[in-house]
């Protein structure tokens, strides 16, 4: 699948961006207060759908964790990539821990 037709309209998000067990250096993109333990691709798809964002699963492996089978998610872009990541992180945290 070519991703050129999605450029500018969608962002690619990896579950590792939201993983509390990883450091920023290892790929986490959100503060620890918003991160959760080992998020899955399925969880990200559910959270995006709950927020009204179109999302599609992609195949692939995170380069820093090539042994991990969790693939990325293509998510509709609303605002900047940082804003989309933060929005998903807050909802993921709320669903997981009720905070």
Swiss-Prot record:
InterPro entries listed in its UniProt record: Signal_recog_particle_SRP19 (IPR002778), SRP19-like_sf (IPR036521), SRP19_arc-type (IPR022938)
Gene Ontology biological process terms, A to Z: SRP-dependent cotranslational protein targeting to membrane, signal sequence recognition
UniProt keyword annotations, A-Z: Cytoplasm, Ribonucleoprotein, RNA-binding, Signal recognition particle
Major location category of this protein: cytoplasm
Coiled-coil stretches noted in the UniProt entry, renumbered to this chain: none
GO CC terms in record: signal recognition particle
UniProt GO molecular function: 7S RNA binding
Gene3D superfamilies: Signal recognition particle, SRP19-like subunit
Family annotation (Pfam families): SRP19
Keyword RNA-binding carried by entry: yes
Compartment(s): Cytoplasm
Keyword Acetylation: no
Similarity section: Belongs to the SRP19 family.
PANTHER family cross-referenced by the UniProt entry: SIGNAL RECOGNITION PARTICLE 19 KD PROTEIN (PTHR17453), SIGNAL RECOGNITION PARTICLE 19 KDA PROTEIN (PTHR17453:SF0)
HAMAP family registered for this protein in UniProt: SRP19
Oligomer and partners: Part of the signal recognition particle protein translocation system, which is composed of SRP and FtsY. Archaeal SRP consists of a 7S RNA molecule of 300 nucleotides and two protein subunits: SRP54 and SRP19.
Function, as annotated: Involved in targeting and insertion of nascent membrane proteins into the cytoplasmic membrane. Binds directly to 7S RNA and mediates binding of the 54 kDa subunit of the SRP.
Protein name, per record: Signal recognition particle 19 kDa protein
